[in-house]
Amino acid sequence: MKFSVKQKLNILSILLISISSCTSVEEPLTAVGPVPNEYQLAWQELEYYAFIHFNMNTFTNKEWGYGDEQPSQFNPTELDTRQWARVAKESGMKGIIITAKHHDGFCLWPSKFTEHSVKNSPWREGKGDLIRELSEACKEYGLKFGVYLSPWDRNHPAYGSAEYITYFRNQLRELLTQYGDIFEVWFDGANGGDGYYGGANEERRVDKKSYYDWPTTIEMVRR
């Protein structure tokens, strides 16, 4: 079969286009605007998890405890953290965060740095550790575990001083090192205000931007 000059040119053009298409390399896309880091992407992929506010406030019916509550008021006799974890798992949640310490300063674990904790409550005859029970329940059901730790402590007499920051970080270190992997840490309520403060019953304000030295605290969390 003979081809005319025009037909030959058309065939040649098609071949050249095909070769060009096969050998072209697409340039990588350039991001427009801020790009999420690995921590932000991991958080986004969680999609759905529980935040449980369970602490002394559960028994005093207060949104914020004043700090003068007695450990004897905390006695959840029917507590079953495995039920919490099971329901969370069945609901499609991927993790649980618990208020390990709210603004009233009461600790759900037997912190060695304060007497204002479950170790002086009637629950489990003073031998309970709700943080441990819940962290183990989360592990059993394949859930991530996180903690909320209030920077503001209306119970501690040293709040507002440098001494308190050492106390706060000591408690944070306990939570980060004694209960397995912690996927998220919440800090909330850092302004200060009125409180019991070991019996002082006064108002204490702090500079929330400088008092806590957040960069150092955040570095502790990310180690």
Model-based region annotation:
Residues 6-14:
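Sec-dependent signal peptide recognition
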Residues 19-21:
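C-terminal motif of bacterial Sec signal peptides marking the signal peptidase cleavage site
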Residues 25-223:
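Mature catalytic domains of secreted/periplasmic carbohydrate-active enzymes
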